[in-house]
Structure formats: C-alpha cells, structure tokens
C-alpha cells in the first residue's frame, strides 16, 4: 500500500440509504491510491451474530467495525478497512464488513440479496458467520446463496441460460469459510468424532428423494457445493458469560475463554495464510484501482436494474486500463527516444534503429499492462500512434538536418559570396580560381560531422542557386576560348545531373528503408501479440481445467451419495424381504406341525 494510505479505522464503501446502494467517493479515493495487489475478505451473516468482532481481529484491533450491544443492526451497507497484509509483503488486506442480513425492520430481503451478492463478487474469501450449529434453520437462513443464479451473470451473452451461465461461477467465486459462533455441541456424527471441516461436509450431504421437501433441503447445499469448491469451517465457543458480551470489544484476551481466544487466533492465521489475492478471469490480479472499478461497475448495474455481469465488469475495467496502458507505452517511447536520439541523425537507418528498439520496449510495456483487448483495438491504436511518432521524428530529423546544413553553408560559403560581390573572380583566369575555391569549400562542408540526411540535397540546392553566378564568371573569363567555355558548361550540367541522380537514389534508399521498417514494426507487434495470446490461452485452459475438475469432483460426490443412498435403500429392502421370508417360513413350519 502506498505510504500515504493509512486507515486508522473502517469507512463505509457502499452506503445503503432508503433501499438504494451508493458507492462512497471518499472510500473509492482510498482504493484508487492502493497500487498493491489486494486480498479481499468479506463477511456476511445474520445481524447481531458478531461478524464485526472477527473483522476487527483480522485488522489487528479490538475496536473498529461497530459491534453494537443491542438487537439493532449497526452496520449499514458495506464497510471497508484497508490494512497492510500481515503475512504477504507488498499486499494490502481489504476487509469488508457487511450489513447484517435478515433485519426485520428492512421489510424485504431485496437489499440483503444484493449485499450478499456484492460480498461474493468483490471478495477473494467469503466468510459466512452464523450462530450455533449447521441445522436446517441455518441452511434456510443461507437461502441467499440459492439466489445467486438470479443475481449474477458470468457472461454478457443474452442467450446464456442460468444453468450454463452459473456453471462458470466457480472460476471467479471466492473461497468459502463458515464460522459457527457460540458452538456448544460435540463435533461428531454417528458416534464418530469430526473435525470442523468434516462437520461442514457432513452437513452438506444431500438427502435422497424427489419430493419438494427433499428439493428444498438439497438446494442450498447443492449451491454451496457447486459454487464454492474450496470450503473451510471454524467453530467458536462462547467467549464469555452472555451478560458481558456487550463489553466484548473492551475486554482483553486474558478475560475471555482461552479456548475461544485460540479459536479466533486459528481463524485469523488461516485467513492470513490461505486467502488469495483477488483475481479476475485471465489471471488478472486486482489492485486498489481495479477494485474501485469493480465496485462502480456492479453498483451501476444494480442501479440500472441490470444483473452484475463478471464479463462486463472485466471488459469495463479493460477499457480503462488498456487506454492507460497505451498512454504508459507512449510515455515510455517518448522517454527513451528523448534520451537516445540526437537530431539530426547521421543516417535514416540510425534513427530507425533507435525507433525500433524504443517501439519494442513500448509494446512490451503495453502488453504487460493490458488485458482483454477485444479485437486488439488498443494495440492497433498504439501501433498507429507509434507509427505517427516515427514519422514525426523522421520529419523533425529532416528539418534539423536542413537547418544544420543551411547554417553550415552560410558559414562556409559566405566568404566566397563576398569575394564574388567584390569582383575578385571577374578577371582573366578568375573562373578557374572560383571553381577551385568552390571545390575546396565543398570538401570542407563534407568534412563537417552530423549534417544528417539532407546534407547532399541542401548542398545541391545551394549550388544550383549559384549556377547563374558561376555562368557569369565563366562568360567574363577572357582567357578561356568559346570551345572551353562550352565544355565547362557541359561539365557543370553533367555534374548537376549526376548530383540529381544521386539524390534520387538516396530518396529511393530512404523509401526502401521506411518500407522495411514498417514491415519490421508489424512483425514485432505480431510476435508480441502472439506470445501474449499464448500466455492468455494457457491461463484460460488452466482456469477451465480447474472448473472442470471441480465439477467432476462434485458430480462424483453426488453419484457416490446417491449410490450410498440406493445401497442403503436396497439393504433395507433386502432386510425387509428377509424378515418377511422368515415370518412366512415360521408360519409355514407352524402350519406343517399342526398338520
């Protein structure tokens, strides 16, 4: 977490006012400043079951989230507390305490369902807190989990049915932890001792039958098993005498039941060690700004009357981040070119080589910071901007070369121009002296470094502009015969034509270099895109295999339970038949003896 982020206490993240859920701008501002990956732990459960106490312990405090001391629910909406992660360096632990479910004063359960849904969508670990044992009443109170198929969509496709869509929930749902408060029973089943985890699995067993009562019994169990493949259970003794529960946050651990203190420590240790970084489809690790975006996307969807959609949330996040990734890549390119390029470059190839290195690095920056670039629109935008940057540099290089060469010509040839004006060469033999001086100055010009790509063109343009002066000196030179003058004129024309041909050749070379550079640029983008697509494909396959494995395990478990049920039923039928047969045999023997 950034050094300036220090939350001394929790803040409301999602306000619940008059049945309307609204994101708190101040809390979003805090999230936007957290650049580290986040581990998000959310707790849900009925009101007045002590959720806030556990969250305060995870924050390393006795006070923070409001505990309250009456049957009135204190927490409204969803509250957030961001603290440095105690076990994962460079990570931030985001704790979300939710409004108590089932408050009769709220009138209906609509808001409760949305609070539960948001807790599921935003967290990487979901803690469900309840009182006592896992009995049918506890399962009935967890009916919110059965509504998730009506509250969440994984894909944006309107033709996806609920069953197909909900099958993908496991790929992005959080781990599930059930905390049982004031647990007073012995952990056992059929006379055998159980661990809390075994107790949870035992409680999630399905009943055999097809009646409506059986379906109602199985539905919440099936949903928990289907949506949350990784499950954990913790039981907590009563911490202190009930009369003192109201002062729980004021009491020190020494004043509480030692067993309860140890149970809380075990719970916190598990959460710190096992809660994963919040991750989206495609292996995208969530940081503060990404969590902020998810909150806004889900809240806006609920406000519009739409279902929160994971795919849409990821795409909305991708739009923001890919746009920022383009700007980050361009900034890197500008920085690198600014440091490396000295205009004018001696050759076009020198400039293009520097561009290509900077372009490759910029593309790598984009690839590292982008995801879900549908149809590669943002990469195409980046490529277009980099092409324009290259063309701009080429233009600047050309202008810098022209300016440099023009300035050199002014310095080198101005003395000659002054001599021409003074008539020094308007005399017999003056033409030869002029040509010799001209050639000496050209040589001096060529020896000057870093003239750039316009060196020849600017020189030839200058010389062409002085042809009339050269011709005038030639015509006034009385030593030369008319024939010699004609030969000199032809030589000048030949040299001019040769220079023009050289300029055309240089232009063709520049054009060829530009075409080759564009092809190299295209191939580099394709190469990096292909590598990124391969990584994303591997990530997708891993996620799909994980989802498939989870489904197969659940299917095998259901079949096993069904077979066990059928086996038990068959065994009962066999025993019943044996008893019937025994009775008939006894009756037959009795009847036979009478005969």
Curated annotation (Swiss-Prot):
Enzyme type, top EC level: hydrolase
Keywords: Antiviral defense, Coiled coil, Cytoplasm, Golgi apparatus, GTP-binding, Hydrolase, Immunity, Innate immunity, Membrane, Nucleotide-binding
An example Gene Ontology CC term for this record: cytoplasm
Gene Ontology molecular functions: GTP binding; GTPase activity; identical protein binding; protein homodimerization activity
Record note on what altering residue 105 to E does: Promotes ubiquitination and degradation by S. flexneri IpaH9.8
Organism field: Homo sapiens
Catalytic activity: GTP + H2O = GDP + phosphate + H(+)
Record-listed GTP binding positions: 45-52, 67-69, 97-101
Protein name per UniProt: Guanylate-binding protein 3
Main location: cytoplasm
Pfam hit, one: GBP
EC number: 3.6.5.-
Subcellular localization: Cytoplasm; Cytoplasm, Perinuclear region; Golgi apparatus membrane
């Amino acid at each position: 977490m950034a050094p300036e982020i220090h939350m001394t206490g929790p803040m409301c993240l999602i306000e619940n006012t008059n049945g309307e859920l609204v994101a708190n701008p101040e809390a979003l501002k805090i999230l936007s400043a957290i650049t580290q990956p986040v581990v998000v732990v959310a707790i849900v459960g009925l009101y007045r079951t002590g959720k806030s106490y556990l969250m305060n312990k995870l924050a390393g405090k006795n006070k923070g989230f409001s505990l309250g001391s009456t049957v009135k629910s204190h927490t409204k909406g969803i509250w957030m507390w961001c603290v440095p992660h105690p076990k994962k360096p460079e990570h931030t632990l985001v704790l979300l305490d939710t409004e108590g479910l089932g408050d009769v004063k709220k009138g209906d359960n609509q808001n409760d369902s949305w609070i539960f849904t948001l807790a599921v969508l935003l967290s990487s670990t979901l803690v469900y807190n309840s009182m006592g044992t896992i009995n049918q009443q506890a399962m009935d109170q967890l009916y919110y989990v059965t509504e998730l198929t009506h509250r969440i969509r994984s894909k944006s496709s309107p033709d996806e049915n609920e069953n197909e869509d909900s099958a993908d929930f496991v790929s992005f749902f959080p781990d599930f932890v059930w905390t049982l408060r004031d647990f007073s029973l012995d952990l056992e089943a059929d006379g055998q001792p159980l661990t809390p985890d075994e107790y949870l699995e035992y409680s999630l067993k399905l009943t055999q039958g097809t009646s409506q009562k059986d379906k109602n019994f199985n539905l919440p169990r099936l949903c928990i098993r289907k949506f949350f493949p990784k499950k954990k259970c913790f039981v907590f003794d009563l911490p202190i005498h009930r009369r003192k529960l109201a002062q729980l946050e004021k009491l020190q651990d020494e004043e509480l039941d030692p067993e309860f203190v140890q149970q809380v420590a075990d719970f916190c240790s598990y959460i710190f060690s096992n809660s994963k970084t919040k991750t989206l489809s495609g292996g995208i690790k969530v940081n503060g700004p990404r969590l902020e975006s998810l909150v806004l996307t889900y809240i806006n969807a609920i406000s519009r009357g739409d279902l929160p959609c994971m795919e849409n949330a990821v795409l909305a996040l991708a739009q923001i981040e890919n746009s920022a990734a383009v700007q980050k890549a361009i900034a890197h390119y500008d920085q690198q070119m600014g440091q490396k390029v000295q205009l004018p470059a001696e050759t076009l190839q020198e400039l293009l080589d520097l561009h290509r290195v900077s372009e490759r690095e910029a593309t790598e920056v984009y690839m590292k910071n982008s995801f879900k670039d549908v149809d590669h629109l943002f990469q195409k935008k980046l490529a277009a901007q980099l092409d324009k940057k290259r063309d701009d540099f080429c233009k600047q290089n050309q202008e810098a070369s022209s300016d440099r060469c023009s300035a050199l010509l002014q310095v080198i040839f101005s003395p000659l121009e002054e001599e021409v004006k003074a008539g020094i060469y308007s005399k017999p033999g003056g033409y030869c002296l002029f040509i010799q001086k001209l050639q000496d100055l050209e040589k001096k010009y060529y020896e000057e470094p870093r003239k750039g790509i316009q060196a020849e063109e600017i020189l030839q343009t200058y010389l062409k502009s002085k042809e009339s002066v050269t011709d005038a000196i030639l015509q006034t030179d009385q030593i030369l015969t008319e024939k010699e003058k004609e030969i000199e004129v032809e030589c000048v024309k030949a040299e001019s034509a040769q220079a023009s041909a050289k300029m055309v050749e240089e232009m063709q070379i520049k054009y060829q270099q530009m075409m080759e550079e564009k092809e190299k640029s295209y191939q580099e983008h394709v190469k990096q895109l292909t590598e990124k697509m391969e990584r994303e494909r591997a990530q997708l396959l891993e996620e799909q295999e994980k989802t498939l494995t989870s489904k197969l395990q659940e299917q095998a478990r259901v079949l096993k339970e069904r077979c066990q049920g059928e086996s038990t039923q068959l065994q009962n039928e066999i025993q019943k038949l044996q008893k019937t047969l025994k009775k008939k045999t006894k009756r037959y023997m009795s009847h036979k003896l009478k005969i």
